[in-house]
A protein has these predicted regions:
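Bacterial carbohydrate/catabolite-sensing allosteric modules
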Residues: 6-7, 11-235
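Active-site core of PLP-dependent enzymes with the aminotransferase class I/II
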Residues: 1-3
């Protein structure tokens, strides 16, 4: 949570009510969380593109102040850094910089459909030799695919694409989109079980000022991957 959302969140926590964050983590203050391996998911997606021979791989990222966006961007960079061939190809584009928006192969889509479309156009115009793109959020995936259609780009002949989440949308796109999937049902079950456990603990004790930092729990879940027809083998 950030900005106005964080203020509401802080007030809620101070009231003593149990809180479970889903796919978010607080930087200042401990809180129960249910998280997926966002870093690993992005890393795996980019590695899949590399195995197909892609070297110039763009990424449409989310906002800097969102935990999941930072983790997915980290996974993207780790995958590129682990490949000495890709690292040499993209050396000038992946240098550590104070402002990540200076990186040509990264474009911020702000986790929105419109943002995804705008970021896709920017990547395409700034990187004419880009052969693949990883889109790190569902809404941005929708926007990016809309822009790809508007630009007349053929997938995967001209550009390979891996999106994020929503199996139904991935199946509706032509060609079928390869996507990272999140265990939505497991996330909901884990969050509900954790919250119920906290409510039971609260009922069993009269001490409402107990130290939450000693009892917070983080549950990690793995993502999946659905192979479509949107990635070309250019190796």
């Amino acid at each position: 949570p950030s900005g106005a959302e964080k203020k509401v969140f802080d007030r809620f926590r101070k009231s003593g009510r149990p809180v479970v964050l889903i796919d978010r983590r607080m930087e200042n203050g401990d809180c129960d969380c249910v998280l997926v391996d966002n870093e690993g998911a992005a890393q795996n997606a980019v590695k899949r593109l590399m195995k197909k021979g892609h070297k110039k791989i763009g990424m449409i990222t989310g906002p800097d102040n969102v935990y999941t966006a930072r983790e997915r961007q980290r996974g993207y960079k780790l995958a590129l850094q682990e490949s000495s061939k890709a690292q040499s190809e993209q050396q000038s584009d992946l240098k550590d910089k104070t402002d990540r928006k200076d990186t040509k192969l990264l474009a911020d889509g702000n986790y929105t459909i419109a943002g995804g479309a705008k970021a896709m156009r920017k990547l395409y115009e700034d990187n004419p030799d880009m052969t693949a793109v990883f889109i790190s959020n569902y809404e941005m995936t929708v926007g990016a695919m809309m822009e790809i259609n508007d630009l007349g780009i053929k997938v995967p002949e001209q550009l390979s694409v891996i999106g994020f989440d929503n199996v139904d949308f991935a199946r509706a796109v032509v060609p079928r989109l390869s996507i990272v999937t999140q265990p939505t049902e497991e996330i909901g079950q884990a969050a509900a079980n954790l919250l119920l456990s906290r409510l039971e603990d609260k009922d069993e004790t009269s001490d409402k000022t107990s130290d939450k930092t000693e009892t917070t729990e983080t549950i990690w879940l793995k993502t999946g991957f659905v192979e479509g027809e949107s990635v070309a083998d250019i190796s």
